């Protein structure tokens, strides 16, 4: 079966089996491995991608269900080659990642949150990431990273210049 997906702004036509998950399509057919297979039951959130700007579990959706939708993966959030988005930069600065397994999903979830709410409260951030499990950080640094990114995206708390 042929599906057309708009992945990271680029129209992609892919042959898939009717029961292939969007996660498997992204990883196996399009070689975009940023979305991770964790529980494969929609519980852990490691497979999160953005579909038309909203976080979605790619392990729970068939690729054919995504036909015609705009899908953003972690590979699509950087402003350019070798550059980091403000959210990615804040995660690095605050040590908001350790093993990195949940990081792509957390960053994509943060992108969706900050697109809808550029000035979130701590409670807004905690609520937004509550569907993503992290077993390493205890979430404090992740929340700090998202809050810092929100400030910077609003023009506040600029990073120090790099030499």
Q: What is each model feature region?
A:
Residues 1-163:
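Signature of N-terminal electron-transfer/Fe-S-associated modules in redox systems
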């Amino acid at each position: 079966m042929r599906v057309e997906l708009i992945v990271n702004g680029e129209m992609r036509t892919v042959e898939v089996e009717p029961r292939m998950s969007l996660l498997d399509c992204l990883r196996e057919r399009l070689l975009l491995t940023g979305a991770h297979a964790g529980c494969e039951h929609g519980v852990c959130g490691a497979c999160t991608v953005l579909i038309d700007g909203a976080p979605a579990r790619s392990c729970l959706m068939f690729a054919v269900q995504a036909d015609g939708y705009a899908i953003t993966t972690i590979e699509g959030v950087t402003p350019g080659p070798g550059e980091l988005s403000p959210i990615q930069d804040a995660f690095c600065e605050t040590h908001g990642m350790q093993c990195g397994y949940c990081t792509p999903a957390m960053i994509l979830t943060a992108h969706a949150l900050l697109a809808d709410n550029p000035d979130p409260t701590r409670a807004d951030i905690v609520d937004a990431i509550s569907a993503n499990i992290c077993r390493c950080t205890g979430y404090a640094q992740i929340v700090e990273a998202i809050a810092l990114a929100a400030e910077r995206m609003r023009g506040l708390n600029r990073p120090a210049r790099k030499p």
